[in-house]
């Protein structure tokens, strides 16, 4: 976020916490990208703050990223995590002192989460695969309506096609992304793999190594689809250790993931710290063709 917006986001998080009776003194920004993540102390709550521009209706954007859809996704995220916590799945849950819902202050959408102190950075690949398998088992036990992964692909295709959303994308690169998404999604759908609720982006940045064991966070992009879609977001050493995974399907999903990330980096509204530099890198990886690398290797 731009600095003035980030300051307002922190203030909104403080206000939301105070409104529900949580004491707030110091604040620490844990992550600042398209959504701000801030630790509030001494109540030790993690507030995830979505800016007003992401919540307002934007006719040029695809439905996945429209304001109405984004608010629905935040509500779905809270419900999915609430249900997972109830069946003891490995998740960093919502703060139990706060009603499990989306709060709105000064136009910002805010959700309140339990803070878990990290106890190390690297999770061994075998442990990562095991805890992801455990998460998937927990997800199969809950019944929460989520979008299909193809809804997300279709939204990315719309953004790629829109010169208003991706104005700086060269026409050859626009065609590369459009063709990649079209061809791979058609191949994947024709495989008719078994589907279930998924995390949506279980990459290493969304796994906390805590004293309670590894915990998944950030279910904002939870979708319905084959487990191989989730596996396309994790390092290769992890996906190879996941029991009974179709590695060919994982590879195809990796191409989809690279194309989606590239499209996001070229969006006019993207505020990811890596910016256009990573957008170029992902396009170059796609040009090289299969086998596509995991996104963390680009």
Name each model-derived stretch.
Residues 3-6, 10-11, 48-106, 122-134:
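A conserved alpha-helical element in kinase catalytic cores
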Residues 115-174, 195, 298:
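A cross-family kinase active-site recognition segment
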Residues 1-25:
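Juxta-kinase regulatory segment immediately upstream of eukaryotic protein kinase catalytic domains
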Residues 194-199, 204:
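Catalytic-loop of the protein kinase fold
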Residues 51-62, 106-122, 155-168, 259-277:
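A glycine-centered beta->alpha junction motif in the catalytic cores
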Residues 196-197, 209-254:
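Active-site Asp-x-Gly
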Residues 236, 244-298:
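Helix-rich C-terminal or lid/interface subdomains of diverse kinases
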Residues 19-41:
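ATP-binding glycine-rich phosphate-binding loop
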